[in-house]
C-alpha cells in the first residue's frame, strides 16, 4: 500500500522525522549565504586551473567560450580577432580540426556538445567572403625604418606560417623560404582538396603577407642557399620548420613489391 514503508520498526512504529530543507524563496540572503568571489571560486565542470574544459582540450588553447559568446551577440569581427590571438589559421582549422574541444564539452553530458568547430568555420568563412578582410593590427616600431633584424623562416607549413604571423604581428618583416611552389606544407600536399580547398590556404597566407611577411617559393635552404649565405645576407635568426612528412608501410608481406608506396607520397603526387 502507498506509504506502507514510512513506519520504521526501529522507531517503534512512529513515522521518522525527516530533515526539512530550506526553500530558496524562503531564504533570507546575507553575507553568509554567498561569496563575493563566486566567479573565481566556483570551478565546477572546469579544469583544476579554473579553465573551461573546451579551452584546456584545444591544442592551441583558443578562448572557445569567449568567441562563442561574441558570435552569439553577432560580434563576428571581434570573435575572429579573439580566435586569431591563438590560432592564425581559423579557416583552415575550421575544415580539418579534430574537434577535441567538442569531445571535452560538458554540454555533451546533457544532450550534444556545442558545435564549436562549425561556429569557428562560419566566423572564418564570413571573413573569407567579405569585401574587406580582417588584418590583425601590427605593432608600429617607434624607431625610423622599423626593426632591422632580419629573420628567416625555413618552411611554409603550419609551423612556419604561425611563426611568420606572430613575428609580423610584433612588427618584424620575416622572410619565409619554401622549397615547393606553393605554401602550406602538408596542408597543401597532404590533405585532398575535397577536404581542404587550396584557395582557402592561399587566402590565409595572403593575410600573413599583408601583415608584412615575405614569401620566397622554390628555394630549398641547404641546397639552393646555405645558412652561411643567409647570414652573409644579414639574417640574424632562423626558425626551422621543415616538418616531418615521412610515411610508413603496414609491415605486411609484399609491401616491397613494385608500385607499392606510402600514403604521404601518394597524396603529394
Language model: regions and residue ranges:
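General small-molecule cofactor/ligand-binding pocket signal
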Residues: 175, 214-218, 261
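Short hydrophobic core segments
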Residues: 154, 177, 235-243
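Residue-level detector of alpha-helix initiation sites
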Residues: 88, 157-158, 182
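N-terminal Rossmann-like dinucleotide/flavin-binding domain of flavoprotein oxidoreductases
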Residues: 80-87, 119, 187-235
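N-terminal Rossmann-like FAD-binding beta1-loop-alpha1 element of flavoenzymes
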Residues: 149-175
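Glycine-rich FAD pyrophosphate-binding loop
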Residues: 172-188
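Ferredoxin-type iron-sulfur electron-transfer modules and their immediate structural context
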Residues: 1-147, 198, 240-268
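Phosphate-coordination loops involved in phosphoryl transfer and adenosine-cofactor binding
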Residues: 147-150, 218
Amino acid at each position: 500500500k502507498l506509504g506502507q514503508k514510512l513506519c520504521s520498526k526501529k522507531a517503534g512504529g512512529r513515522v521518522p522525522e525527516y530533515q526539512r530543507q530550506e526553500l530558496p524563496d524562503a531564504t533570507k540572503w546575507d553575507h553568509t549565504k554567498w561569496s563575493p568571489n563566486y566567479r573565481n571560486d566556483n570551478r565546477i565542470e572546469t579544469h583544476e586551473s579554473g579553465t573551461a574544459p573546451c579551452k584546456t582540450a584545444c591544442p592551441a588553447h583558443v578562448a572557445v567560450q569567449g568567441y562563442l559568446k561574441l558570435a552569439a551577440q553577432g560580434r563576428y569581427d571581434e570573435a575572429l580577432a579573439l580566435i586569431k590571438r591563438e590560432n592564425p589559421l581559423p579557416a583552415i582549422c575550421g575544415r580539418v580540426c579534430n574537434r577535441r574541444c567538442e569531445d571535452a564539452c560538458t554540454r555533451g553530458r546533457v544532450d550534444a556538445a556545442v558545435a564549436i568547430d562549425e561556429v569557428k568555420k562560419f566566423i572564418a568563412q564570413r571573413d573569407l567572403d567579405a569585401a574587406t578582410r580582417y588584418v590583425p593590427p601590427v605593432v608600429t616600431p617607434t624607431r625610423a625604418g622599423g626593426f632591422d633584424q632580419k629573420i628567416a623562416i625555413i618552411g611554409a607549413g603550419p609551423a612556419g606560417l604561425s611563426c611568420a604571423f606572430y613575428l609580423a604581428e610584433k612588427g618584424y618583416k620575416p622572410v619565409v623560404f619554401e622549397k615547393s611552389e606553393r605554401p602550406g606544407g602538408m596542408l597543401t600536399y597532404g590533405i585532398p582538396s575535397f577536404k581542404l580547398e587550396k584557395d582557402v590556404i592561399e587566402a590565409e597566407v595572403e593575410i600573413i603577407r599583408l601583415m608584412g611577411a615575405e614569401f620566397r617559393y622554390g628555394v630549398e635552404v641547404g641546397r639552393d642557399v646555405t645558412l652561411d649565405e643567409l647570414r652573409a645576407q644579414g639574417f640574424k635568426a632562423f626558425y626551422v620548420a621543415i616538418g616531418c612528412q615521412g610515411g610508413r608501410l603496414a609491415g605486411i608481406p609484399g609491401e616491397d613489391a613494385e608500385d607499392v608506396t606510402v600514403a604521404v607520397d601518394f597524396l603529394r603526387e
